[in-house]
Regions:
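N-terminal nucleotide/polyanion-binding subdomain common to many enzyme families
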Residues: 1-9
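Short, basic, glycine/proline-bearing loop/turn elements
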Residues: 4-5, 72-78, 108-109
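Generic structural signal for residues in well-ordered beta-strands
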Residues: 14-17, 75, 160
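Short gly/ser/thr-rich secondary-structure transition/capping motifs
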Residues: 10-18, 82, 142-144
Length: 195
């Protein structure tokens, strides 16, 4: 589906991809991005030439059409509020096997104007536990191409920036939760820097 979405993206949204040289071709990887619209996982996946699994809000996967499409395309259900051990175990296994997992640390779409909401620490926590790097990604313009309240996307310009790999590090004697929060703020700063 990536070639089809690339064509659609260039035709309808003048899709621009920057920093694709930063995308690792193999090895366990978390792809962490801001979240502006339901187009995001598909647009971000266009230049990535490896299987990706998506952690998606479990409620969305119950929607009649969208849920089925997302499952076929590799989405796994995640309870956004609280802990979800099954989704985390599944992600760890996939990462140990050298797979890539896409996570939106905002836990849902950001603000309607495209600005971000505070990141949850799950992406960094999984990266630390699985000992894998994070590919920070910034998506711009998707909030205007498919704003909240509109049933289908419209035309617009979408730009995706793939930043250099981020390696979260726990400081000596640092509490795991404090580390995940601190490193999540650093990750958010990297992604926000290109908005």
């Amino acid at each position: 589906m990536r070639p089809a979405f690339r064509l659609i993206g260039h035709t309808f949204w003048d899709l621009k991809l920057r920093g694709i040289q930063n995308i690792p071709q193999n090895g366990g990887l978390i792809i962490a991005s801001n979240h502006q619209s339901y187009l995001d996982p598909f647009a971000i996946s266009v230049p990535i030439k490896r299987p990706i699994r998506f952690l998606a809000w479990n409620e969305v996967l119950n929607w009649p059409f969208v849920g089925k499409v997302m499952r076929v395309l590799g989405a796994w259900p995640l309870q956004v509020e609280g802990s979800d051990p099954a989704a985390i175990r599944r992600s760890h296994q996939w990462l140990r096997e050298g797979g890539a997992v896409m996570i939106f640390p905002e836990g849902g779409r950001g603000q309607p104007d495209g600005s971000m909401v505070r990141f949850k620490a799950g992406a960094v926590r999984i990266a630390l536990e699985a000992r894998v790097p994070i590919l920070p990604v910034t998506i711009r313009g998707a909030n205007r191409a498919w704003p909240r309240g509109r049933l289908i996307p419209g035309r617009g310009k979408i730009e995706i920036i793939y930043h250099p790999i981020f390696h979260p590090q726990q400081q000596p004697e640092e509490d795991a939760r404090a580390c995940a929060r601190r490193e999540s703020e650093q990750l958010a700063g990297i992604i926000r820097s290109a908005l």
